[in-house]
């Protein structure tokens, strides 16, 4: 799909996608790193919005509000709401959380559209072990919303357990009984970059996939 290729091209151009040796939040060593925070210009955000919107339209899921967890999810949800309005004419609500509750003004830890009783689509960037997504779901539960689905920028396709061939997204789908989609996957990254990597980088990626990727 053209929007995937455009995102991957920009990811390499702006060092969103890098190869080397990186330590993930989990402590695992990885031969590649994807930092969506390096999408910092209007053209990049336009490409991101296009990709999220096309993925959501293809999901054909019914929802009222787009929720983006702080911090990276905030801008992702905002630009996606704009792009969906341009493409479909539907004006979806947009909301996000504060990591620190505000004690003055409107107060609280939720900003944006009213969500109580609404169908909410959760957006985020990269999923590895699913910790951030579970935290976002825990935040939403007491708000009395109906979670309609989850859309991610990148699925690293990693096993939850080295001994079990099940991905984080696979487990989430089973646990939540909800649609969970990602724009990009590790397979997409490998296919797009295979002719550009050095021999050492290719070897490291192959070894990493053999050890950690869910088949």
Curated annotation (Swiss-Prot):
One BP term from GO: pyrimidine ribonucleoside biosynthetic process
Family matches, as InterPro entries: OPRT, Or_phspho_trans_dom, PRibTrfase_dom, PRTase-like
Keyword Glycosyltransferase: yes
Any one Gene Ontology cellular component term annotated for this protein: cytosol
Sequence similarity: Belongs to the purine/pyrimidine phosphoribosyltransferase family. PyrE subfamily.
PROSITE patterns found in the cross-reference section: PUR_PYR_PR_TRANSFER
Cysteine pairings via disulfide bonds: none
Residues that bind orotate: 33-34, 128, 156
PANTHER family: OROTATE PHOSPHORIBOSYLTRANSFERASE 1-RELATED
Keyword flag NADP: no
Pfam families referenced in this protein's UniProt entry, alphabetically: Pribosyltran
Complex and partners: Homodimer.
SUPFAM superfamilies hit by this protein: PRTase-like (SSF53271)
E.C. number: 2.4.2.10
Name the UniProt record assigns to this protein: Orotate phosphoribosyltransferase
Pathway involvement of the protein, from the record: Pyrimidine metabolism; UMP biosynthesis via de novo pathway; UMP from orotate: step 1/2
Signal peptide (from-to): none
Binding-site positions, 5-phospho-alpha-D-ribose 1-diphosphate: 25, 71-72, 98-99, 102, 104, 124-132
Domain of life: Eukaryota
